[in-house]
């Protein structure tokens, strides 16, 4: 009798994706982040579902409903903080995953890469709208500032902003629709992730060497299921350390003050995982220019395959590109730090230099370094 896992219409899909999947034998821990992102997404959907049972999306009661969840609901505090800090873990895994893709040349799988970029934008939109829901000071002003950026679009900008707001300012209509979108988008992310995986399994995984591993494949289970479980345990350990010991470490104290349209906080800033993009936005004095730079800071990933001038796929044997990659990482950390600082000297200048360097590394230095490395191969 044939094994049910290979014949049953549903189970054979799971089998070909997670059990008998031929996988390169040499993929490192950097390949763990895909499964960790899946775990983060499921965790966020589950905790979010339980929060939505007690949350009210009304400007008068939103803040107090979050307080009610933390004080009165059984284990409400842990659900709320797992959701808030789960978002941070989600973005840590996301940036590691994208960084891995850049380092090892995984962007040559065009469909998988482009779906990944769409996923990144969708997750960022979801996180932004989620940050608005507690209706604290930073929620309100963050929503006001970021949605207002759309007014920089010529001709239709102002109408577009008012259409998104559902009025002439961020108010009840805005909060209600943000809650609706924040609830539905994770399921869109789930569907996109399935498509992402579908395209990945068409080609098979990349590996650290960047050369074809068709001659050396091993089954996903038990080798990588065990490895993924270890990664998951470490992820949950870090998340629970955050949740149980310093749940507000990554949050903003201003968000413990209820939203007040008449009082602007001294420093409006988004969550830490958006600070690098926020710093790029602020470093350009022109409003439309800033918005374009903000979008391009992520969209630039889409042209990574076009800028690939190297004869080798990954950076494993390319020391110049490696140095530039880690310079890019340092630059992003600098931008993250700058995004959280007030707009004053010397932070403005540092932010502008870091922003220029970010685009220069990706658009100019890396392609040139690849050409130099190609020539070194001939020596």
Curated annotation (Swiss-Prot):
Binding site for heme b b562: 83, 182
Keyword Cell inner membrane: no
Cofactor binding description: Binds 2 heme b groups non-covalently.
Keyword vocabulary terms for this entry: Electron transport, Heme, Iron, Membrane, Metal-binding, Mitochondrion, Mitochondrion inner membrane, Respiratory chain, Transmembrane, Transmembrane helix, Transport, Ubiquinone
Cofactors: heme b
Binding site for heme b b566: 97, 196
Assembly mode: The cytochrome bc1 complex contains 11 subunits: 3 respiratory subunits (MT-CYB, CYC1 and UQCRFS1), 2 core proteins (UQCRC1 and UQCRC2) and 6 low-molecular weight proteins (UQCRH/QCR6, UQCRB/QCR7, UQCRQ/QCR8, UQCR10/QCR9, UQCR11/QCR10 and a cleavage product of UQCRFS1). This cytochrome bc1 complex then forms a dimer.
Protein name as it appears in the record: Cytochrome b
Provenance organism: Erignathus barbatus (Bearded seal)
Annotated gene: MT-CYB
